[in-house]
C-alpha cells in the first residue's frame, strides 16, 4: 500500500511538472481545468521564491525567473524536496490571475536585471556589505516576493483576491495590504510529502467555486435581461 502511494505521488509530481511548462493563457488554464490562481513556492535552502500558474513547477520557470544568477542569488535546484508552498493566491477571474503572475515575474526581472544596484542597496546587509544570510538562507527574497504580491494586487486593483498562507506572519503587517481588495487565511496543516495532494485539492476547490460564481453571475444577468424585456414589452 505504501509503495502504491509513493508511486502515485511520483506520477502526480511528474505530470504536474509537465503541466507547469510554459506560460499559460486563459484558455490554457481552462483546458487544463485550472483555477485563476498563483502559487508561490519557497526554497527551504536559499529562501528564494518561485511563481507558478499551476500547482506545480518546471525547470523552464526557474530559468525564466532567475535570469542573472550570482553567488548571492544562485539559480536554485528544481528538487521537489527543497520547495514548499508559501502561499496560494486566488483571484476573481483568469484575467486577474494572469496579470498578477506576469506582474510578479516582471518585478523580479526588474529587480535582478534593470535595477540590480538599486535593489541591492535596499536589502539588509551583513558587516561585510553583502546581503544578510544564515548559512545559504537569505530571508530578503521571500520578503520581496510578499511585497511584490501586495504591490501587484494594489497596482492592478485586483479586487476579490484571497491569499492562503503557510503561516499568517508571512504576510507582514496588515497596513501593507488593502483590505478592500484582499482577504487572508491560512493553508490547512499538511505533511510536506503530501504537498501535491493539498495543492491539487485547493485547485479543485477553487475551480468549483469559480464555476459556481460564474453560474450565479449568468443567472443574475439572465434575470435582469428578462425583467428589462418585460418592462419594455
Swiss-Prot record:
Compartments in which it is found:
Nucleus; Mitochondrion
Low complexity bias spans? 215-233
- Which GO cellular component terms are attached? mitochondrion; nucleus; ribonucleoprotein complex; ribosome
> Looking at the record, which segments are called Disordered?
214-233
- Please tell me whether the keyword Nucleus is annotated for this protein: yes
**Which superkingdom is the protein from?**
Eukaryota
Q: What GO terms are given for molecular function?
A: DNA strand exchange activity; single-stranded DNA binding; structural constituent of ribosome
- Record-level GO BP terms: mitochondrial genome maintenance
Hey, which family's this protein in? Belongs to the mitochondrion-specific ribosomal protein mL67 family.
Protein name, UniProt field: Large ribosomal subunit protein mL67
Which source organism does the UniProt entry give? Debaryomyces hansenii (strain ATCC 36239 / CBS 767 / BCRC 21394 / JCM 1990 / NBRC 0083 / IGC 2968) (Yeast)
Amino acid at each position: 500500500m505504501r509503495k502504491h502511494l509513493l508511486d502515485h505521488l511520483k506520477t502526480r509530481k511528474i505530470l504536474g511538472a509537465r503541466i507547469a511548462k510554459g506560460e499559460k493563457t486563459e484558455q490554457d488554464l481552462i483546458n487544463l481545468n485550472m483555477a485563476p490562481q498563483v502559487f508561490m513556492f519557497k526554497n527551504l535552502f536559499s529562501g528564494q521564491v518561485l511563481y507558478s500558474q499551476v500547482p506545480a513547477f518546471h525547470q523552464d520557470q526557474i530559468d525564466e525567473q532567475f535570469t542573472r544568477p550570482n553567488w548571492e542569488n544562485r539559480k536554485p535546484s528544481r528538487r521537489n524536496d527543497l520547495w514548499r508552498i508559501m502561499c496560494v493566491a486566488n483571484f476573481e477571474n483568469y484575467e486577474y490571475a494572469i496579470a498578477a503572475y506576469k506582474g510578479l515575474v516582471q518585478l523580479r526581472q526588474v529587480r535582478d536585471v534593470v535595477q540590480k544596484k538599486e535593489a541591492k542597496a535596499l536589502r539588509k546587509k551583513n558587516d561585510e556589505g553583502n546581503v544578510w544570510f544564515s548559512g545559504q538562507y537569505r530571508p530578503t527574497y521571500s520578503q520581496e516576493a510578499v511585497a511584490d504580491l501586495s504591490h501587484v494586487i494594489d497596482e492592478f486593483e485586483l479586487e476579490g483576491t484571497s491569499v492562503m498562507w503557510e503561516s499568517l506572519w508571512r504576510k507582514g503587517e496588515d497596513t501593507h495590504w488593502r483590505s478592500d481588495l484582499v482577504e487572508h487565511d491560512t493553508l490547512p496543516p499538511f505533511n510536506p510529502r503530501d504537498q501535491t495532494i493539498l495543492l491539487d485539492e485547493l485547485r479543485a476547490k477553487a475551480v468549483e467555486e469559480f464555476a459556481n460564481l460564474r453560474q450565479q453571475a449568468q443567472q443574475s444577468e439572465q434575470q435582469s435581461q428578462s425583467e428589462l424585456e418585460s418592462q419594455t414589452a
